């Protein structure tokens, strides 16, 4: 997993350094948008998992109380 992370960082650095300033600026802007989307998706997934755990816990408590 770490290998892929380093590979992505290396590719991004090479692309930014090899491109002209205008292209690099546009690429960085696009890349930052992509990173924000990924972070948002991870955050939403964590919230859904937490909500699911709360619902499952509540259901287990109800079953234990009635059972």
From Swiss-Prot:
Pfam families: Stomoxyn
Source organism, top-level taxon: Eukaryota
Tissue: Constitutively expressed in the adult anterior midgut; proventriculus, thoracic and reservoir regions.
GO cellular component: extracellular region
Functional description taken from the UniProt entry: Has antimicrobial activity against most Gram-positive and Gram-negative bacteria, filamentous fungi and yeasts tested. Has trypanolytic effect on T.b.rhodesiense and limited hemolytic activity against bovine red blood cells.
Keywords tagged on the record: Amidation, Antibiotic, Antimicrobial, Fungicide, Immunity, Innate immunity, Secreted, Signal
Record flagged with keyword Cytoplasm: no
Subcellular location field: Secreted
GO biological process: defense response to bacterium; defense response to fungus; innate immune response; killing of cells of another organism; xenobiotic metabolic process
UniProt-recorded name of the protein: Stomoxyn
Annotated signal peptide: 1-24
Record lineage: Eukaryota, Metazoa, Ecdysozoa, Arthropoda, Hexapoda
Main localization category: secreted
Source organism per UniProt: Stomoxys calcitrans (Stable fly)
Sites bearing Threonine amide, chain numbering: 66
């Amino acid at each position: 997993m770490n290998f892929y992370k380093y590979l992505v960082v290396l590719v991004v650095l090479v692309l930014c350094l090899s491109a002209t300033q205008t292209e690099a600026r546009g690429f960085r802007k696009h890349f930052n948008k992509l990173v924000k989307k990924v972070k948002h998706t991870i955050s939403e997934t964590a919230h859904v998992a937490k909500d699911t755990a709360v619902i499952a816990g509540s259901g287990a408590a109800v079953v234990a109380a009635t059972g």
